[in-house]
Amino acid sequence: MLQGHERSITQIKYNREGDLLFSCSKDQKPNVWYSLNGERLGTYDGHQGAVWCLDVDWESRKLITGAGDMTTKIWDVEYGTVIASIPTKSSVRTSNFSFSGNQAAYSTDKAMGQSCELFLIDVRNADSSLSEQEPTLRIPMTESKITSMLWGPLDETIITGHDNGNIAIWDIRKGQKVVDSGTDHSAGINDMQLSKDGTMFVTASKDTTAKLFDSESLMCLKSYKTERPVNSAAISPILDHVVLGGGQDAMEVTTTSTKAGKFDSRFFHLIYEEEFARLKGHFGPINSLAFHPDGKSYASGGEDGFVRVQTFDSTYFENIFE
């Protein structure tokens, strides 16, 4: 149980090796934890608003965060200093490094008369001059705003999930949409996470389902149904398992008891689409989930402001579906 945030968690992420766990929340200060024993290593102090998203690069050297103070910041992971702060015209909802770590993408909200836009920046030699530089690519979103984002294979495409349930793939060289999923989801997409090999990804949606999609064709492969909005979903790196987390909207939380089981982490079989386990823990909806890269534990961040790291026992690995 990691206690270091004063307000609800918005996103959590492991680095590639899994020794560090990053968390951000609405309290303006992203944290980094040592995942093995839950020791807090430090905070990244500099944002003036709720931090909505974060990502760490392949080498665990840079961290990118996006916040409601209308900035995207790039940090030095080890020293906690701001390398660059990029101003935007509305709050930043998603941010991700590419696999190579040479580029980063972020998207802004449709708010205050501004349309939602997707930006691409070159972060190879990132320094304070990045705030004055023009982004390498800028794509306005005419229809629905972006609520989650992933990099596609080989850093050639970006996959975006939208507020109306659409998923699209953008070719970053041409700067245009190449694939559109249509209406597999009937409500907004809260989260998208890739499988370990990048061939597929799982979505979490307000329409009470999580779905598995092919990363290139956006073909819907599997669907995992629940009774309430899904806020986050993650794919196990070693087993055919998916974990979903959710609950109702934050404003309805006080009207239900925790016994109703609405705030559990729910485990589904990736292929058979069957739920086989639930884990309790949070006193409110789960906002973000992440599997440890070795697949032996997972972390969840909730509306209650806690991050919980849960390690699986041996029976979890023996639970083979017949």
UniProtKB/Swiss-Prot annotation:
Signal peptide: none annotated. InterPro entries: eIF3i (IPR027525), WD40/YVTN_repeat-like_dom_sf (IPR015943), WD40_repeat_CS (IPR019775), WD40_repeat_dom_sf (IPR036322), WD40_rpt (IPR001680). WD repeats lie at residues 4-43, 46-85, 141-180, 184-223, 281-322. GO terms for biological process: formation of cytoplasmic translation initiation complex. It comes from the Eukaryota. SMART domains: WD40. It comes from Drosophila yakuba (Fruit fly). Keywords: Cytoplasm, Initiation factor, Protein biosynthesis, Repeat, WD repeat. It holds the Pfam family EIF3I. Component of the eukaryotic translation initiation factor 3 (eIF-3) complex. The eIF-3 complex interacts with pix. It is found in: Cytoplasm. Coiled coil: none annotated. Belongs to the eIF-3 subunit I family. This is Eukaryotic translation initiation factor 3 subunit I.
